[in-house]
């Protein structure tokens, strides 16, 4: 994006105000007022940036592109002169992704909203744990049962989760692959920043452990990644069979 102007590039609410947002806190279900706000881009600018990313990846010989928001968040623009509904945006996103896929590039999306399933090669950060509401007795992988064998997916980055072992077991139960988020920089560089969630991302510090986890997982479950899930049963508290 070559420069950003709020009145030109930001999407609009129905009351004609520009869409200015704050990050959402999953712990207390409210806006994080101590964080920096950001503006929601107009739909056409989002699509143009995806196209630019695809062209840049092709220039460098990239095998594919990874998209953080498409497939995860779908927004409208209520600008009275150029109204774009969520349904219109969905159709335009799918058309663009179909074109990228037809060019031979692979596509990785986030979270896994169903409208992108036909054009997605891999989904990251798929929810494997449910809402966690105390009134629920159990979580059942309905979505994963429906799509397993058709598209590959993974839960959270294993090295960044609060409970690595729990996420690993959930991945096995839900037929998910493994996903890691790594960086070359030392974790100490993240101190006193807003990126402390990446403390576990240093490659040198974790490569041996992660390689061992991946090797065992691939050896024991690699042969079933492209098969359908035909049954899922809760045998006892904390014990399931897929």
Where are these regions (language model features)?
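Active-site-proximal substrate-binding groove within the catalytic cores of carbohydrate-active enzymes
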Residues: 3-62, 71-242
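Hydrophobic residues within beta-strands of alpha/beta enzymes
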Residues: 65-67
